């Protein structure tokens, strides 16, 4: 099959829109004699004049050859062997072109996919036509093997190949089809819609971890409400999140209201805002009978300090925090949340319950701002309608408290006495203290007598 090729003059994608680190990888691959294409959703989003979440690269170089080219490269994955080329905190993903893998005997699901192939074979093993577009750095052309350009113009999500077969190979693709259509404002083509309804029960064969990961992506994409509504309409939600399916079926709007608030925040803050899994889990509480407002108002126990502080001062009650963790982990839910995320949410609730109080002393407010999860708890309160003036006041409290906080300094590796490591640990100093002045340490003198542990 001859691909459709759009020359540089026939499309709007420019190198200036591509991440500089991704360009470096593309040019280095080309300079070493390999093909280097920008692939997948990055090409799609740039053609739609949207900001890509990431820039993925396809190449005919093997993972080992890529690793030899880049010292900062790490090979990861089992099902897919991928190369992560690191530039500080940024990662550029490089994948070798693959051809379609066959499922293991007696199974319809492809569990390993490391059979290398050509660019054309790689395009046809991808999920949707709009995700199978390649941008060639050699001549700046866009290569389309599957009809993705036509579907992009028609605002259509179409499966590559037979939808029945492709959804049986990887049932999570059904969730992805719904999520992509909702995020881009596209329609799923009729054949794929019918296939999803026919094979929706196959989703239970997928890893629960992959399903949960897809839900996290949906919650982060800025169109979570619409996506959950469509998952419910297509019948998928009954299998992946039965509690939410039942809530929506009986007309409970709690979940949709929390997702509306989340989407509004994502659109206001942009795609760069990072939300932890714990914050995302909080938006799934309403179908479980736990309104978000309950978790963040008055669940922690107020307990005065016993020292010289005023009557409005408090600390988080460890027993209360422990109770929150127990409540959270005993929730009957079909999604396998990581315990660390559930415990993080419990601590967020304990901190967040104080944010609506108006009787706290300045000292108590300052102490609260020192809590590890204060910023996340404040963020969650902001997402769900906390008064902007109150949010601003709490941020001012946190900034002032941080400015007045004791500073940690580290002495030189080799101090004046010439003994490296004698100042291996930082010292906590009060504001205005001189770091050069060290406290005098006295050695305790041991009384004369027999060695410890010896018989007398």
Predicted regions and their residues:
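Catalytic cores of the polymerase beta-like nucleotidyltransferase superfamily
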Residues: 1-456
